[in-house]
């Protein structure tokens, strides 16, 4: 017996994990209303609008706010999120988008060769973290030139070094803009969605 028309369920063909920033050390719970999380909710929403149902966009919610070496709490949480999706997607169809500490988390996750591209927004890379990203990974770094919390010159130099290793790596500066991606918000969103859409051919 038939009950109405068939329902076409769209199965995503790619996945984007959105990784918020945080602190070097903190055991304070990470809450959705904190700026680092709210800002990346907006990035995730922009990605969903641009990419549609063809791409699954997930924002990772860390348990605590800190990087917390040597526990690496944020890496553990993001790694669990990656483990939850990677059995459904080809590694080349998984993109990591990380802001600040989230850019450092992305570099750590990319080291395993299980993702195709990394977009690092104002990344916190204090120890040449870009060196962890395999040469097979595509990389875009976007950094405000007036950022005083993470170093745009360092991320630019590290991106250049990544290119020397064979990565398809590019660095883009947003002139006069600081760390939190509040000024010229539309440009941050446009550069993010353009990169991911072009990489995934959406």
Q: Where do the PLM segments sit?
A:
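Short, surface-exposed "cap/lid" segments of acyl-processing enzymes
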Residues: 1-52
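Gly/Ala-rich beta-loop-alpha elbow adjacent to hydrolase catalytic centers
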Residues: 97-102, 106
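Short beta-strand/loop motif that positions the catalytic acidic residue
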Residues: 135, 140-147
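Short alpha-helix in the alpha/beta-hydrolase fold that links the catalytic acid
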Residues: 151-161
């Amino acid at each position: 017996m038939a009950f109405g028309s068939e329902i076409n369920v769209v199965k995503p063909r790619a996945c984007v994990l959105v990784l918020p920033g945080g602190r070097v050390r903190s055991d304070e719970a990470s809450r959705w209303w904190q700026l680092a999380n709210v800002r990346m909710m907006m990035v995730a929403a922009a990605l969903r609008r641009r990419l549609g149902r063809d791409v699954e966009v997930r924002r990772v919610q860390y348990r605590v706010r800190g990087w917390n070496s040597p526990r690496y709490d944020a890496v553990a949480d993001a790694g669990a999120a990656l483990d939850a999706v990677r059995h459904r997607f080809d590694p080349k169809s998984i993109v990591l988008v990380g802001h600040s500490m989230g850019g450092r988390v992305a570099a750590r996750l990319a080291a395993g060769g299980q993702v195709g591209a990394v977009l690092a927004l104002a990344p916190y890379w204090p120890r040449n973290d870009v060196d962890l990203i395999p040469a097979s990974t595509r990389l875009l770094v976007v950094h405000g030139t007036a950022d005083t919390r993470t170093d745009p010159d360092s991320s630019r130099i590290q991106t250049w070094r990544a290119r020397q290793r064979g990565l398809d790596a590019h660095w883009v500066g947003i002139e006069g803009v600081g760390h939190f991606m509040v000024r010229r918000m539309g440009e941050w969103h446009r550069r993010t969605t353009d990169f991911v859409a072009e990489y995934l051919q959406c």
